[in-house]
Amino acid sequence: MSLTNTKTGFSVKDILDLPDTNDEEGSITGTEEDTEGSEATKTPGVLVQSPLENVQNLPLKNPFYDNSDNPYTRWLATTDSIQYSLHGLSANSQDTSAKSPEPSADESPDNDKETSSNGSDSGKKRKRRVLFSKAQTYELERRFRQQRYLSAPEREHLASLIRLTPTQVKIWFQNHRYKMKRARAEKGMEVTHLPSPRRVAVPVLVRDGKPCHTLKAQDLAATFQAGIPFSAYSAQSLQHMQYNAHYSAATTPQFPTAHHLVQTQQWTW
């Protein structure tokens, strides 16, 4: 008993100063707690025995202490209740996780019906295609050959003529452009950028009623006012133009009526 009075334990029994019921149990627990206390002094700050183990080692009933008013009586009744209280959350979570799919399984047919109905609606919407009549298709193709891009007023006007909406006309033009582009890509007939139409420069042979003997740079600049670069013509073509100018200047004095013909030709233009 002296050992039990001088011991310093961390169990509920020691904290509440409860007397021992059996000397053997007290001596055994006393020796165990003395050894644990000595080990605790060797390694301070480290608990060798957890409070849960101390609670499990306590006797179930104590004749010297009335614990009917103790709120922890039910908690200290059995070890099974302690383990259940510690692991109750995990068990409940497992039960709820196991039971949670049941309502979803019950509701799954409704959800499947809703999704199937939504899928059928979307499928019906996707399957709807505007069927153009032959007259509408002919008019659309004819207008597409004339003009591949339409403005908003032109689109509305064409839609009113063939009894369609502007959106339908717009979508038809987009699809037709894409179809034509894909057909050209498959055939390898991609249209290259065509050069702008070239204007032919006509040499000035007569100016102000007088024949031009030579073709000067100023005259060439006047003939190229249309924007055609000077490098577009080769030197051979320029020499040919100068030769024609010299030839016309040499032949005009031999025929005095040539000047008169040129003037009348100028008036007839």
From Swiss-Prot:
Check the record and name the Pfam families matching this protein. Answer: Homeodomain (PF00046)
Which superkingdom is the protein from? Eukaryota
| DNA-binding feature ranges | 125-184
Keyword Membrane assigned to the entry: answer is no
Q: GO:BP terms for this protein?
A: cell differentiation; endocrine pancreas development; floor plate development; floor plate formation; glial cell migration; motor neuron axon guidance; positive regulation of DNA-templated transcription; regulation of transcription by RNA polymerase II
Q: Where in the cell is it found?
A: Nucleus
GO MF annotation list: DNA-binding transcription factor activity, RNA polymerase II-specific; RNA polymerase II cis-regulatory region sequence-specific DNA binding
> Annotated region Disordered: where?
1-66, 91-130
Give the compositionally biased regions (Polar residues). 51-66
Q: One GO term of the cellular component aspect?
A: nucleus
Keywords associated with the record: Developmental protein, DNA-binding, Homeobox, Nucleus
Q: What does this protein do?
A: Transcriptional activator involved in the development of insulin-producting beta cells in the endocrine pancreas. May also be involved in specifying diencephalic neuromeric boundaries, and in controlling the expression of genes that play a role in axonal guidance. Binds to elements within the NEUROD1 promoter.
Q: Which PANTHER family match?
A: HOMEOBOX PROTEIN NKX, HOMEOBOX PROTEIN NKX-2.2
Stated family: Belongs to the NK-2 homeobox family.
Q: What is this protein called?
A: Homeobox protein Nkx-2.2a
- Tell me the organism: Danio rerio
